[in-house]
Amino acid sequence: MAPGDEMRKFTRSFFRACPDLSSVTHAIVRQKFLIHVGRDHLEPEEKQALKRLVEEELPKMQADAGTREGKPDFIKVKRSPAPCSDPKKKRFRFNSESESSSSPSSPDGSGPSTKNRTTKKTCLRRALKKAVESTDEDHQTDLDAKMGLEESSEGEAEGSVRSGKVTEEEEDMKQEQKGQVRKQAGAKDKQVPLKADRKQVREESGSSEEEAVLQRAKVEGSTGANCQEESEESGEESPAKKKELSEPRSRSNRAERTARERKSYKQKSRPGRPTGGLRDSEAEKEGGTVGSGDSSEEGEAEKEGGTVGSGDSSEKGEAEKEEGTVGSGDSSEEGEEHSVKRKSKVRTQTESGRRQNTSSRDDSNSTQEQAAAQGTTKSGSLGSSNGDSDTEREVSDSQAGQNTKEERKSRSSNKSSKNGQARSCSSSSDSSPEPTGQKGKARSSSSSSDSGPEPTGRKAASRCGEDHPAVARLKRYIRACGAHRNYKKLLGSCSSHKARLSVLRAELEALGMKGNPSLEKCRALKLQREEAAEVAALDVANIISSTGRPRRRNAWNPSGEGTSPGETYRRTLDSEEEQPRQAPPDWSHMRDIISSDGDSS
């Protein structure tokens, strides 16, 4: 083979295999040719010849690059004329959107798309097999097949994405058509002009797919017209229905929104005042909003009125609030009547509280302080004026974390007996400034009384800390051994649990416990100690012990330090009678008398 023909063949094959011809240079072609030939360098004549070949073949390949893109379609039509000769199926990728939109009434809109995909895949496989078998150069044909496969896979991916969009649009249209009432069957025979159809197709699909959609729309004229007409009719009906449904929804949404805002505001204000009721200004404000006609505000006013009484009325107010938010605006009159009744009840309660206050002013300061402290914890208290509300909130905030347990106890025990006193105290705080001062004193006393139990709590905590489970277990073992110890003296110097445990273990060892202590061992040790005590009580040698603290009689006889107390006792007895010494009598049967006499002398 001539070197010129070999160069020409190489350049053509290289340009066919190259994916991007714009990046090809003379140096790249020369390097590839040297690798192909297996040489180190080229002669100047060969370089010039290769340069001319590149300049000749490169424009040709660039001109043919556009035709290479349509090569897979050409192969498909050429190799498998039966499944791919139909132009409609060939261009299904572009026409699938108009076809699916024009036939929404079909039960399965993805059926033809899946069939066409399978036919495309089979055509592509056959074409690739033919190309691989027919070509002579293995390397070049492999590259061509790879390029064709990439292009076809990209096309198929685009087609699948478009078909997925089409199926989603079709499902949306079906869901809209299910919820709306369709018109009469006579509308199926009508046809919409081609311009309207073209306009809708442009809105649904992109401008790049316009021509294919128009061709498909001409073929599917009648079905597309019917579908468009139904969609337009449904689009005309939907705004009217939405307008009709939006008005009651907007009203109910407003009511629910206001209810939520009020509820959230109350929940924010309640933690500061855990049990305190509403102030007069807030009650008047809530009562003034009743006449607005909004059902949620009326229910809220009912709830606020209900909190003035006992805890049961607050639950009723919450139930009325929920009913007011769910119901429509027709229940406004009933809500106004309920709120008026609540207001009248509040006024009567305040008047009765003032009367009771005039009668209860002569009572002692202790009863007033107790009533004021109880009034802060009761849910029926109305509160003082707006100026004192901030300070009372701060006091209640400081007391909230300390006396929650005491408040619960006081509520459960004094709820029935102290309602009248709390109301009278709260009404007196509204009428005159003196009770407010007394209430402040009562609150300060209650806060001091609340702060008083803290040391007891600390002592209890320290006791709980001393009574560690292991410490308590060892104490129980010592008690089971029959020994009773003063643990305050024994464990007074210990500052940790380990030190206490070591002291208690040493005490058990001193009692005779060996190994790991247990209740059975302790019971056995107790029996042994009791038996040993009985034996010691019966021993004669233990009548008078020479050990122990010094007696007073030793001070009278300074020379008798070396002598035992028994000898001194006998000496004193023998000194009275100057007789010859006889054998000492056995005083064992009289040891109690002798020991008591010796102690008393």
UniProtKB/Swiss-Prot annotation:
Keyword Repeat in record: no
Disulfide bonds: none
Quaternary context: Interacts (via C-terminus) with histone H2A-H2B dimers; the interaction is direct. Interacts with HIRA. Interacts with CK2.
Record's keyword terms, sorted: Chaperone, Chromatin regulator, Nucleus, Phosphoprotein
Chain intervals with Basic residues compositional bias: 117-129
The organism's taxonomic lineage, starting at the top: Eukaryota, Metazoa, Chordata, Craniata, Vertebrata
Polar residues compositional bias, start-end: 347-378, 556-566
Any GO CC annotation of this UniProt entry: nucleolus
Organism of derivation: Mus musculus (Mouse)
InterPro entries on file: HIRIP3, Histone_chaperone_domain_CHZ
Name of the molecule in the record: HIRA-interacting protein 3
GO biological process: chromatin organization
